[in-house]
């Protein structure tokens, strides 16, 4: 059984993270120092640093040991650090905005992922419209996922 190229890349990225954390000789690329971390699972806000390597969070807590000479440090004193928001059910069509415009307006609110139910476009344009929405979604700065409507037209 062989692994896909994507799987091998993911294994390599994760191994790099382990190496950074365990070696004591490799450092984070970015350190968000002294911010107030919003933990959306425990509903707590607490002071902590956040260390980042590439596109991954390495550690939340005291990250001084992960700070090296090439680490970019941002002073987050008085600021809040939290995960991006996921809008888990929305209709671009109901907002009467294009996906691009909706994206432009929602990014400043911290929305990093949009999950669209395109049943209204499906009602009007069918599969062609849904495919066009998916094509536009591929150019958004946010992660955009288009669900397949269970029933079109909606009843």
Descriptions of predicted regions:
Residues 45, 95, 123-126:
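Alpha-helix N-cap/helix-start motif
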Residues 2-21, 103-155:
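Divalent-metal coordination cores built from histidine and acidic residues
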Residues 1-2, 65:
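Short intrinsically disordered, low-complexity coil segments enriched in acidic
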Residues 50-58, 92-94, 104-107, 134-135:
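Short, low-complexity, polar/charged sequence segments that are solvent-exposed and flexible
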Residues 8-31, 36-82:
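Histidine-rich, glycine-flanked metal-binding segment
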Residues 28, 48-51, 65, 95, ...:
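A sequence-composition feature that detects small, non-aromatic residues
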Residues 36, 54-56, 64, 90-92, ...:
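Short glycine-rich, polar/acidic loop-and-turn segments at beta strand-coil junctions
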């Amino acid at each position: 059984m062989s692994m896909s190229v994507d799987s091998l890349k993911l294994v390599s990225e994760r191994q790099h993270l382990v190496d950074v954390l365990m070696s004591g000789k490799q450092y984070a690329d970015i350190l968000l120092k002294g911010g107030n971390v919003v933990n959306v699972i425990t509903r707590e806000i607490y002071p902590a640093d956040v260390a980042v390597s590439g596109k991954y969070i390495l550690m939340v807590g005291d990250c001084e040991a992960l700070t090296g000479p090439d680490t970019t440090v941002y002073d987050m004193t008085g600021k809040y650090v939290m995960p991006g928001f996921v809008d888990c059910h929305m209709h671009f069509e109901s907002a009467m905005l294009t996906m691009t415009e909706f994206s432009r307006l929602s990014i400043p609110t911290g929305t990093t992922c949009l999950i669209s139910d395109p049943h209204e476009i499906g009602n009007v344009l069918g599969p062609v419209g849904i495919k066009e929405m998916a094509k536009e979604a591929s150019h958004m700065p946010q992660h955009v996922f288009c669900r397949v409507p269970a029933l079109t037209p909606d009843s």
